[in-house]
């Protein structure tokens, strides 16, 4: 992260106002402004592992990655700067959590792109920190209020679930396809045959639906699941547990924390990071899969048909097959052979 996002550029227009502030940055932290902002003290909390990776290099222990913020994350902060995400339930979850810990009278700033729905912050916080719009630029809004009443926060009400083929899928705000199985994952699931064996890695596991479905008809598989999202990691753990399935689940920026090689890697890779379109994760997934597949191991991914993954697959593995498709999605399969670029 080097270039600032439009939301951060709006904040920088008011940088003089924060020189004496002790700030907690939270929400959709798409750049390293929390590490570079001139203020009395700066801390950050994020649910995104890749954001933590970047910020921790500069902020050390003053940034923390976890599902929920705790009192230690607030420390003696008197100001919250919250970057609004594109997902309103995610914002509700994060803000209620953080505001339950902030001191009464704390300055609350909410900033975000208009297209993300940042305007709804006013209604969401009306009972706790009534907001006023203090700036509008770069197609973003900046809102300010003071914390008048701390909300009560409990994680339990934010859990949700849905069923698919006899499996219970546990979800949380911010998890991909929180309200039900998405069409792409459904297509990928249709290609997974029963009695699969060996070590399987599910990258970008979301709520764990792919792994749970695979394990339900292939009990001999050994599952490893990873995601950048703390809610996804916790949801996947809960999905496996409630269905009596075993697997190793942890946070990882694609392969950053993955050790060893696998017989199959499956993924429905994201092509957005917050509001921004980004193919970085998918490109890293494909190009680096060769370092995590056994000889003869298989990479199987689903993607929107318009995305340029066939070219990357061919450049990396030498070939690819389309094993299922609809008008919108394709499932790509390739195999680790000697011609793959290691």
Curated annotation (Swiss-Prot):
Coiled coil regions in record:
none
- List the Gene Ontology MF annotations in alphabetical order: 16S rRNA (guanine(1207)-N(2))-methyltransferase activity; nucleic acid binding
Write down the Pfam families for this protein, in alphabetical order: MTS, MTS_N
Per the record, its GO cellular-component terms are:
cytoplasm
Quote the subcellular location field of this record: Cytoplasm
The enzyme's first-digit EC class, named in words, is transferase
What SUPFAM superfamilies does this protein map onto? S-adenosyl-L-methionine-dependent methyltransferases
Which UniProt key words apply to this protein?
A: Cytoplasm, Methyltransferase, rRNA processing, S-adenosyl-L-methionine, Transferase
Kindly state which reaction or reactions the protein catalyses: guanosine(1207) in 16S rRNA + S-adenosyl-L-methionine = N(2)-methylguanosine(1207) in 16S rRNA + S-adenosyl-L-homocysteine + H(+)
**Known InterPro entries for this protein?**
DNA_methylase_N6_adenine_CS (IPR002052), Mtase_sm_N (IPR013675), rRNA_ssu_MeTfrase_C (IPR023543), RsmC/RlmG (IPR046977), SAM-dependent_MTases_sf (IPR029063), Small_mtfrase_dom (IPR007848)
Q: What EC designation does it have?
A: 2.1.1.172
Q: Tell me which family the UniProt entry assigns to this protein.
A: Belongs to the methyltransferase superfamily. RsmC family.
So what does this one do?
A: Specifically methylates the guanine in position 1207 of 16S rRNA in the 30S particle.
HAMAP family found in the cross-reference section: 16SrRNA_methyltr_C
Q: How does it assemble?
A: Monomer.
What is the recorded name of this protein? Ribosomal RNA small subunit methyltransferase C
Organism ancestry: Bacteria, Pseudomonadati, Pseudomonadota, Gammaproteobacteria, Enterobacterales
Which gene holds the coding sequence for this protein? rsmC
């Amino acid at each position: 992260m080097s270039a600032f996002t439009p939301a951060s550029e709006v904040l920088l227009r008011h940088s003089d106002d924060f020189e004496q502030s002790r700030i907690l940055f939270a929400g959709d932290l798409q750049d390293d402004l929390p590490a570079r902002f001139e203020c009395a003290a700066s801390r950050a909390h994020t649910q995104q592992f890749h954001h933590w990776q970047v910020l921790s290099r500069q902020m050390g222990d003053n940034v923390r990655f976890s599902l929920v913020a705790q009192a230690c994350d607030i420390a003696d902060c008197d100001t919250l700067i919250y970057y609004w995400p594109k997902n309103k339930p995610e914002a509700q979850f994060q803000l209620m959590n953080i505001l339950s810990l902030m001191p009464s009278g704390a300055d609350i700033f909410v900033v975000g792109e208009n297209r993300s729905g940042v305007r709804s912050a006013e209604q969401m916080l009306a009972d706790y920190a009534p907001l006023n719009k203090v700036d509008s630029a770069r197609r973003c809004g900046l809102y300010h209020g003071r914390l008048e009443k701390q909300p009560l926060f409990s994680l339990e009400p934010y859990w949700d679930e849905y069923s698919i083929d006899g499996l219970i899928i546990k979800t949380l705000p911010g998890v991909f396809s929180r309200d039900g199985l998405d069409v792409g994952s459904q297509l990928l699931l249709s290609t997974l045959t029963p009695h699969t064996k060996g070590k399987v890695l599910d990258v970008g596991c979301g709520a764990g639906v792919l792994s749970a479905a695979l394990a339900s008809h292939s009990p001999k598989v050994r599952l490893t699941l990873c995601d950048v999202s703390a809610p996804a990691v916790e949801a996947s753990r809960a999905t496996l547990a409630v269905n009596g399935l075993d697997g190793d689940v942890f946070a990882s920026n694609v392969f950053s924390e993955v050790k060893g090689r696998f017989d199959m890697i499956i993924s429905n890779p994201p092509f957005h990071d917050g509001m921004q379109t980004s193919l970085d994760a998918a490109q890293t997934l494909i190009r680096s899969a060769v370092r995590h597949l056994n000889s003869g191991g298989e990479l199987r991914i689903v993607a929107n048909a318009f995305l340029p993954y066939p070219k990357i697959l061919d450049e990396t593995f030498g070939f690819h097959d389309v094993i299922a498709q609809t008008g919108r999605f394709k499932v790509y399969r390739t195999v680790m052979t000697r011609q793959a670029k290691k």
